[in-house]
Amino acid sequence: MIRTVVLLLLGNLWFTANAQSDVSPTGSTDSLSSKYTLENCITEFSMDKIVKTDAGYQFWFVDKDFIDGRTLKMSVVAPHQATHAPHVHAEDEFFFILEGRAEVFLQGEWKSVGPYTSFYCPSNVEHGIRNPGDKELKYLVIKKYQK
């Protein structure tokens, strides 16, 4: 129950944060009603659509081409692995740990965190995430790519 509520709140917060950008100057959303339908606004997880990585896999719930560069991705990292080394990029990111333990890195420091923990990474700041545990690490990443 808590997981469902948290995920609904995350999704609602993320998608409504920029909702006004899709409204025309007259306040009309007619073009949106034809662009966004139940067929393309619902994404169910499927192992057939995962993207394998060296450390596990990723699943894109929302691709950057769907809505103005915003994405929602789930990453699954095998025990004692990291998707990549700490790095820097122009986009900020918001991580939300679903399952397992994570070690998160920000500006030279590591911290161990568990499920239902968020981790915000500002743009152009070195950051990273890895799985120090014996079980899979599963987390969501919300990111908005630059145009």
Which residues does each PLM region occupy?
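Short beta-strand segments in beta-sandwich/barrel cores
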Residues: 82-84, 100-105
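Short acidic-glycine-tyrosine-enriched beta hairpin
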Residues: 109-123
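Glycine- and acidic-residue-biased ligand/ion/polar-headgroup-sensing regions
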Residues: 91-92, 96-102
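Conserved short histidine dyad/triad with adjacent acidic residue
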Residues: 73-89
